[in-house]
UniProtKB/Swiss-Prot annotation:
It catalyses: 3-dehydro-L-erythronate + ATP = 3-dehydro-4-O-phospho-L-erythronate + ADP + H(+); 3-dehydro-D-erythronate + ATP = 3-dehydro-4-O-phospho-D-erythronate + ADP + H(+). Belongs to the four-carbon acid sugar kinase family. The gene is otnK. It comes from Pseudomonas savastanoi pv. phaseolicola (strain 1448A / Race 6). Its EC number is 2.7.1.217. Catalyzes the ATP-dependent phosphorylation of 3-oxo-tetronate to 3-oxo-tetronate 4-phosphate. Keywords: ATP-binding, Carbohydrate metabolism, Kinase, Nucleotide-binding, Transferase. ATP binds at S268, G366, G367, E368, T369, G410. This is 3-oxo-tetronate kinase.
Length: 429
């Protein structure tokens, strides 16, 4: 990773690790040299970071809103000290949150700290089937509340009306930037934003059905100090900086290949990850399932997994992925937070043990799982490389012992993602 004291243009705060990589991937595709930090960088790491965009990955999506606000404001302060011209708060394209927060509370705090009176909220990601119309979020052809997300173990999404969902999380007035305004182009969006501001609206859910809509929104909001949303909303941001003559034309995705062993670790219970695990099993590739009840009983699950990986003689999948019914049964017995925390901790310990055994390439499925794994591996900075599947790039860590990682949000990736990611990480991804 080259270093030269360049001033970053865009500062990003992501509420989980895979969301951060998703956003960083989008920015790299737009030509911005992007570095992802696991938490707020230390002074040593920060010295001379050479990047057009810096994405700080927090683990705040499901933390109490007061904690999420404090962490996000600390990240904001760090980014502003580096001279970032615009701030982007990234959350999931399925708006993962509850009435307790914390998308609204964090957005509210960032707005106030930036002394701004308005921001957009747009989690749309059409390339992955997430679209918004009349304020309602769709996943493919289904409303969010009927897409399987209503069964999410930590943030069950039972309402697709994002205006209503966001309003429950903030004291500020929430409005809607409807599609008919977006269809009028950049000036139409700017005019509608002016009207919303005059009505006392501080946050507006923005409709978006296509990438073209996201480019329109991005251009229209070039002067807003804060934007919030999914990675899709960042599509148009590199173009704004390029138009202003602030962005160089280079290959932002260039990376080196990393040699060593490889593994797939999956903790997500999402529909997509369940399909990816099934595809691996159908190919008769070696896999070991971790049972949270065994962890709770004190069985040597981590040691068994490390032995399994060592003796397999080929790349293995170690997974805790389960169906929604199985997840609910475990949660009923162990509790929601305890069951998830135990799985994350175990997969983190397994990753650390595999690192000590020579594994250097890690494919990880699930936002919470990815957070646990990168922390266990001691990863602090990631250089973002080429895209594997929409929203998921290959990455390489900095430091004396570089690692190649693919950190996948639970619901992202094609059915053959695991095999595809391993292949890309093994090359000059």
């Amino acid at each position: 990773m080259s270093l030269n004291n360049a001033r970053p243009l865009l500062g990003c705060i992501a509420d989980d690790f895979t969301g951060a990589t998703d956003l960083a991937n989008m920015l790299v595709r737009g030509g911005m040299r992007t570095v992802q930090s696991i938490g707020i960088p230390s002074a040593e790491m920060a010295a001379g970071l050479d990047a057009d965009a810096i994405v700080i990955a927090l683990k705040s999506r499901t933390t109490p809103s007061a904690d999420a606000v404090a962490e996000s404001l600390a990240a904001l302060e760090w980014l502003r000290e580096r001279g970032c011209e615009q701030i982007f708060f990234k959350y999931c394209s399925t708006f993962d949150s509850t009435a307790a927060g914390n998308i609204g509370q964090v957005s509210e705090a960032l707005l106030e700290q930036l002394d701004s009176d308005f921001t957009l909220a747009c989690p749309a990601f059409p390339e992955n089937g997430r679209t918004i119309f009349r304020g309602h979020l769709f996943v493919q052809d289904q409303l969010l509340s009927e897409s399987g997300m209503q069964n999410h173990p930590l943030t069950p999404m039972t309402d697709a009306n994002l205006v209503r969902v966001l309003q429950a999380q903030t004291r500020h007035k929430v409005g809607l930037l409807r599609y008919d305004s977006i269809a009028q182009g950049v000036e139409g969006v700017r005019n509608r934003i002016a009207e919303l501001r005059a009505e006392g609206v501080s946050m507006a859910i923005a409709d978006a059905l296509s990438d073209a809509d996201l480019y329109t929104l991005g251009e229209a909001c070039a002067d807003l100090p804060l934007l919030t949303g999914g990675s899709g909303l960042a599509l148009g941001l590199p173009g704004n900086f390029r138009k202003a003559g602030k962005l160089r034309d280079i290959d932002a995705a260039k990376q080196v290949a990393i040699s060593g062993g490889e593994v797939v670790l999956a903790g997500s219970a999402s529909v997509a990850t369940n399909g990816q695990v099934a595809a691996w099993l159908e190919d008769n590739r070696p896999a070991l399932r971790i049972n949270p009840l065994d962890l709770a009983a004190g069985k040597p699950v981590v040691e068994q997994a490390l032995t399994f990986a060592r003796d397999a003689g080929q790349t293995v999948l170690i997974y805790a992925t389960s169906t929604p019914d199985e997840v609910k049964a475990v949660q009923k017995e162990l509790g929601v937070e305890r069951s998830g925390a135990m799985v994350e901790a175990a997969l983190g310990e397994i990753a650390k043990g595999l690192l000590n055994a020579g594994v250097r390439r890690f494919v990880v499925a699930g936002g919470e799982t990815s957070g646990a794994v990168v922390q266990a591996l001691g990863v602090q900075l990631l250089q973002i490389g080429a895209q594997i599947d929409p929203g998921v790039p290959a990455t390489v860590s900095s430091g004396a012992q570089p690692l190649a990682l693919a950190l996948k949000s639970g619901n992202f990736g094609a059915r053959d993602f695991f095999a595809k990611a391993l292949k890309q990480l093994a090359g000059a991804a």
